[in-house]
A protein has these predicted regions:
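Extended, highly charged accessory segments
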Residues: 60, 83-87, 95-101
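C-terminal edge-of-domain segments
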Residues: 78-80, 104
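Gly-rich Lys/Arg/Thr-decorated short loops/hinges at beta-loop-alpha junctions or inter-strand turns
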Residues: 110-118, 141-146, 187, 205-207, ...
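Iron-sulfur-associated redox domains of electron-transfer enzymes in respiratory
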Residues: 1-77, 87, 217-507
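Iron-sulfur cluster-binding cysteine motifs and their immediate structural context
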Residues: 128-151, 159-196, 201, 205-220
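Conserved, function-defining core regions and hallmark residues within catalytic/recognition domains
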Residues: 123
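N-terminal [4Fe-4S]-dependent radical SAM core
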Residues: 91-120, 137-138
Length: 507
């Protein structure tokens, strides 16, 4: 639903904005506690319900959303626990993360049916009965001339759906489960959505696709602002998918906008994408097929975790190259050892990547574009009034690096780099977007169908530009991204001025 400002989007925006405003304007623990009690009434004012069965239910959900936005955990449903319980652990100027990242607010869940095939009133009672003829379980009979499905026999194969000439039979599925390429969502004993964290890779497609806003990820807005207020030198590193996310925001306006939030400096993660491209190009040339039959890209954490989790025997075939986020963070910390790095991008899975032991010291905070918009609104940053200073434009990365934001862009960048390094080398490529298709690609690779290939996996359909933390219509963003790529002075990763620093970043 990105690009559509729904009531769910509005609620999320208001929560992020109010949490950011509270963090900027308040200092005392007691004041935070008071505001946490008051925010549900500020966000849902008045006496009448607006979206749900009760205004009290709406406010209870907001209270949990506020906690999660501050990095805190959901409260137990069977105990009386204050909204501010555990606040003292959250009021810190450092990364605060207590698993799980992705949470279902149970009383916000609609308990949608998992999967149902049913006959609608559009059934014409035709003579051919194709629905009955194709059913392998004899689950379809006719009552008063109309098709009827015996749900106890139906196996949800969908053949009747495809055969009906009137499209009178429909297949409905719980949206969050349908969006999950890992099959990680099932029902609890009350029919509400429940996440199997052994399967979940935090792509957060379930969150994007839940029409009731019951699925929420934890945030680091609160801790980031504490760090800024403490006077830390916080440097924002921004993923190239930022293009078109903020109305009226040009690349050259972004730096000033971030300064108004308190950031000391801003860099583009595309710098690290160039270095990642070079790493993966070299690895591919050295290892495929001499050591491994194929190589998968590394930059999407949800894809790489999925591949290693479901295909452990092929785990060595997934590139060990550091991601653009980590490479950019390390490059900045080489120049500014005391800097604190905040990655800002389209991806919630980056929050987990940044919590890994190998990455924790490099990346201090992670925000999505949606969360960043909350900061802009809290500080009343007017994009139209920002100076469009050409000196503030990003100009240190290649067009190929900016292309990482769209599906197919990572593989194309690596191929172009290999052509520069070894013009005679032929590289076969296969790309997949969405974890379900990524899984199919890996199954084919496991069967030997992609030997010699470079495989690009993107957990989000469309790539990062359509990530769970984006705001804009992905189709429009892709068009703007292509324009942004064409404006780059450098075209291929091998032209990066930071190539000599690459060896220093491997430690």
């Amino acid at each position: 639903m990105r690009g559509i400002y729904t009531p769910v989007t509005d609620i999320r925006r208001k929560v992020f904005t109010e949490v950011a405003r509270m963090a900027y304007e308040v200092n005392e623990l007691s004041d935070y506690e008071q505001l946490m009690r008051e925010l549900p009434f500020k966000i849902i004012p008045g006496e009448e319900k607006s979206l749900r069965s009760s205004i009290f239910l709406e406010r209870a959900i907001i209270s949990e959303r506020v906690r999660l936005a501050m990095g805190m955990s959901l409260r137990p449903l069977d105990e009386s626990v204050p909204a501010s319980e555990g606040l003292e652990h959250s009021v810190i100027a450092d990364k605060y993360y207590e698993p799980p990242l992705i949470n279902v607010i149970k009383f916000a869940c609609n308990a949608c049916p998992e999967k149902v095939i049913k006959v609608t009133a559009m059934c014409q009672g035709c003579l051919a009965h194709p629905c009955q003829e194709v059913c392998p379980k004899h689950a379809i009979s006719f009552r008063n001339g109309k098709s009827h499905i015996d749900q106890s026999l139906c196996v949800k194969c969908g053949r009747c759906v495809n055969s009906c000439p009137y499209s009178a039979i429909v297949k409905t599925e719980r949206p969050c489960a349908a969006a999950c390429g890992m099959g990680a969502i099932h029902s609890d004993e009350h029919g509400r959505a429940e996440i199997d964290y052994d399967k979940c890779v935090s792509c957060v497609m379930c969150l994007v696709n839940c029409p009731f806003g019951a699925i929420v990820d934890k945030g680091q807005i609160f801790q980031l602002i504490q760090s800024i207020k403490r006077g830390d030198e916080v440097v924002a590193i921004v993923a190239p998918a930022f293009i078109n996310q903020f109305p009226g925001m040009t690349p050259s306006k972004l730096k000033e906008a971030m300064r108004q939030l308190g950031f000391a400096d801003v860099a583009e993660v595309a710098i690290g994408a160039d270095l990642c491209t070079i790493d993966e190009a070299k690895d591919f040339m050295e290892e495929v097929p001499a050591k491994i039959p194929f190589m998968g890209t590394s930059c999407c954490p949800a894809w790489s975790v999925m591949a290693k989790k479901l295909f452990p025997q092929q785990a060595e075939c997934i590139s060990m190259a550091m991601t653009p986020m980590v490479l950019t963070a390390r490059l900045i910390k080489k120049e500014k050892p005391n800097a604190r790095i905040c990655f800002i991008g389209p991806c919630a899975a980056k929050k987990l990547e940044a919590s890994r032991r190998s990455v924790r010291s490099e990346v201090d905070f992670v925000l999505t574009f949606e969360e960043l918009m909350g900061l802009f609104e809290a500080k009343a940053v007017n994009f139209a009034d920002l100076p469009d200073n050409p000196e503030d434009a990003f100009n240190s990365a290649s067009a190929d690096a900016r292309g990482f934001a769209a599906s197919g862009g990572v593989a194309q960048a690596v191929v172009n780099a290999i052509k520069k390094m070894d013009p005679d080398r032929e590289v076969k490529v296969m790309s997949a977007q969405g974890l379900a298709d990524c899984k199919k690609m890996m199954m084919m690779a496991k069967a030997g169908k992609y030997n010699g290939y470079l495989l690009e996996g993107m957990a989000c359909p469309g790539g990062c530009i359509a990530g769970a933390g984006t705001l804009a219509d992905p189709a429009k963003s892709v068009a703007m991204l292509n324009k942004y790529k064409n404006e780059a002075a450098m075209k291929v990763a091998t032209e990066t001025p930071y190539q000599d620093s690459l060896d220093l970043l491997h430690y």
